């Protein structure tokens, strides 16, 4: 199992609005594991990963899932919203566009250089898993089950 090169490193905190205008403050999401999925509407492997994230979300009700749609071009929010609706992404969704940013994006804060990238953060905000691509669903699911089950023991 490949864990993050930042294993036990603290996750950068962010406080932003989701696509519905609700405030999302990572520091206030306490006591639960958090799965962050960095994706883009322009990224076919990202779109292929969405059903896998959805399955993880459905199978792990105590897991907080945050999908962060990251784009470099503006005017992609309508397409992002369409994908979120079509794929039934009924968890926290954040949209960020480089051209509209006045401060570093969450992707920049997390040193994301390829999409999709998936990060698992434990209850004390330490990064315990990081993976690039969409082909390690079984590994990710195993890590989540092991971590979340040990939390509930």
Residue ranges and their predicted role:
Residues 25-47, 53:
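Short active-site neighborhood of thiol/selenol oxidoreductases, capturing the structured segment around
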Residues 152-153:
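Non-globular targeting/processing and membrane-anchoring segments
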Residues 36, 66-68, 94, 119:
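Conserved hydrophobic packing residues within short motifs/helices of P-loop NTPase cores
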Residues 1-17, 22, 27-32, 58, ...:
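N-proximal helix/coil linker or "cap" segments that precede and/or mark the start of modular domains
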Residues 48-88, 98-108, 142:
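Structural microenvironment flanking redox-active thiols in thiol-disulfide oxidoreductases
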Residues 33-34, 63, 116:
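Alpha/beta-hydrolase fold active-site loops
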Residues 48, 89, 96-145:
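Thiol/disulfide oxidoreductase modules built on the thioredoxin-like
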